[in-house]
Amino acid sequence: MSTRSVSSSSYRRMFGGSGTSSRPSSNRSYVTTSTRTYSLGSALRPSTSRSLYSSSPGGAYVTRSSAVRLRSSVPGVRLLQDSVDFSLADAINTEFKNTRTNEKVELQELNDRFANYIDKVRFLEQQNKILLAELEQLKGQGKSRLGDLYEEEMRELRRQVDQLTNDKARVEVERDNLAEDIMRLREKLQEEMLQREEAESTLQSFRQDVDNASLARLDLERKVESLQEEIAFLKKLHDEEIQELQAQIQEQHVQIDVDVSKPDLTAALRDVRQQYESVAAKNLQEAEEWYKSKFADLSEAANRNNDALRQAKQESNEYRRQVQSLTCEVDALKGTNESLERQMREMEENFALEAANYQDTIGRLQDEIQNMKEEMARHLREYQDLLNVKMALDIEIATYRKLLEGEESRISLPLPTFSSLNLRETNLESLPLVDTHSKRTLLIKTVETRDGQVINETSQHHDDLE
């Protein structure tokens, strides 16, 4: 804005700095001294000094003084008590009138600038009111529409999150119950497997006994066969002996027929044969009895072993059926567990997806809230900047008011008359020519501070002749 640039330049020209508030990190103090001296040779010298000091926009003060001094700076000049050089007085009066004219022009310019500043302040106040109205409107809109929408959506999201949390807890409880059932069934399966192993070990021992009984039976059968062969051999041997004895008996009969006087051998042979037959029958009966007893014992042991084997087979079949039923039940429970785990994973994935969507929505809403906060902060900063500019303008207006009051008080003072001046006559021959040039000395002092410490200080002197 052109008005702001003009005000900033005028503020810089009057106070030695910018028209806005100073930065918090670096403070600058400007000291500007303007001295105007009118040299009138060595007799009369009116001097006008102007000093304007500014350390900060909040502490500006202005000192403006104008005086007429009479000096005598030339040694050895003869002074008279009763004569006045009116040419010098006319020159002084002319210079004084010119100074007053210039001051009137400056006051007129200051009045114009003051009016411009007042207009600018009014304009900035209007802009400030407009911005405040917009800020209040934005606050009302955000509170009425966006706030209610965000709160309603947040409540809905929280309700859904709570529902999903409850569903997840319920599924976790069901999963824990199924896990306990599976663990119990696994323990039961382990017990059944141990019992099956014990039954198989018992069956293996019974099979070993059966094998041993079969081997014993085979051995006994071989013994029976060998005994039968031995009996057959003994029978055959006995028959041969009987035949031999009969042959001998026949021969003895012949001999008896021939010789009647010999002893009777038939009775002896009959006795011997009866004895052998009785011994053979006895041995055969004993062998048969022993074989029968052994065969009965072995048959009884085989029957017992067969009963135990049959019972073991029945138990094994029963255990096998139980294992198969438990295996089927475990497989069914595994399928149920897998389906539940799959459903739980799907629910967790859906929950994670919905949570991510809700999180994105929350993040987007938070970003919008942050953007609105930043926009409000920007409006507040603009308002603060405008307030700082207004304060600076108020300070400048107060300064101008003090200047105007000082000028009014100075103008209201009566002008000194030449009759009241204590003038001394000087030797006009020794007076130099009147110096009509005005000397203006400008002192610019810049002080930079940071965190309360002076980091740089510069001074500049400018001498201008008018």
Curated annotation (Swiss-Prot):
Chain positions found as Phosphotyrosine: Y53, Y61, Y117
Sites carrying sugar chains: S7, T33, S34
Ranges where the record places region Linker 12: 246-268
Gene3D superfamilies cross-referenced by the UniProt entry: 1.20.5.170, Single helix bin, Vasodilator-stimulated phosphoprotein
Chain coiled-coil ranges: 96-131, 154-245, 303-407
UniProt keyword Plastid, yes or no: no
Protein name, UniProt field: Vimentin
Gene that encodes the chain: Vim
